[in-house]
Amino acid sequence: MAYEFIKFEVKDHVAYITLNNPQKKNPVPNPAKKELIRLFDICDFDDDIRLVVIRGAGGCFSAGGDLNAMRDRLERGERGTRYNCRLGSEMNLRLRNVKKPVIACIEGAIAGAGMSLALSCDFQIAAADTKCTLAFVNIGYVPDSGATWLVTKAVGQVRATELFMSGKRFSGQQAADWGLFTEAVPPEQLEERLAKYIDK
């Protein structure tokens, strides 16, 4: 089956889900969320799949929500915004319930809804120089897609509040040091480290 926003392939019992809109830094608009929910179902119930890897095309994990689509929803009124929040939460809850290990392979940049997606995985392996932000406050948006729970659970209330309220940028290495990511490695070692996780 062909997907508009996602590249999907299975090789040696590993499912590779790649956010595939590199020209826009792999945003996660609502149609992409629907595709991801469908793929998480496939990964969960296909006995040939033993492990799932999620990453972004073009050297960037995900810039988060599609700002143009978000602006259009706001112009349509509150109902569109509520639907967006609900769909993001549904996507990440479905991901968290996949009964196989899921690895987020993070590089380039990650923000907003992309961060929520990565934190819903079992493991987060990041390039140490990844540019990270929770960004919601910078666009006047409330953290959605389970972000408030996921981030607070990972780093505690004090640091989570700082990150949400400041919208500051931090590196993949800092994220790993805080416990937000599983680990960070030099960028040139990312593929090798991912391969070791897969081999386990």
Report each predicted region and the residues it spans:
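Conserved CoA-thioester-binding segment of acyl-CoA-metabolizing enzymes
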Residues: 1-57, 93, 191, 197
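Generic recognition of short, well-ordered alpha-helical segments
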Residues: 30-31, 65, 116, 146
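Glycine- (often His-adjacent) and acidic-residue-rich active-site loop
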Residues: 56-93, 110
